[in-house]
Amino acid sequence: MRRITYPYSKIGIDNQARHRPMADVILIASNGESVRFEALADTGADFCLFPLNVAKLLGLRLDQLETATTTGVGNASNLTYCDDLTIDLGDGIIFTTRVGFTWGMDRAGFGLLGQQGFFENYNVEFRHRDRIFAIESA
């Protein structure tokens, strides 16, 4: 069983900043391209979702990807491009899952690790008071 512990990251500016469970991940596309990116462990996200510009960094051709419509806070609808990617969390915790890319995440500047692919396969412990969280292979 493998376990990784991450400190919470501070997101935002000045008195608007909040500490959140962020993991430094490596996204690996089937073409072999990879990019390091931050992702929020989000229990409310149905699946893993990243900014659209990450798909471009990975060299993915949007015209060749499956599309879907996703909704988030405020029920805003976003066109989302989907592909299967490998996500490396470090320390040998690696998984392949369907990932969405949408311009709706570009402003956030980070991705989401959601239920499908992530929470369904790993035990995740949040210790908000200590500002740490841990991911453990099941």
Predicted segments with their positions:
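Pepsin/retropepsin-fold aspartyl endopeptidases
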Residues: 1-138
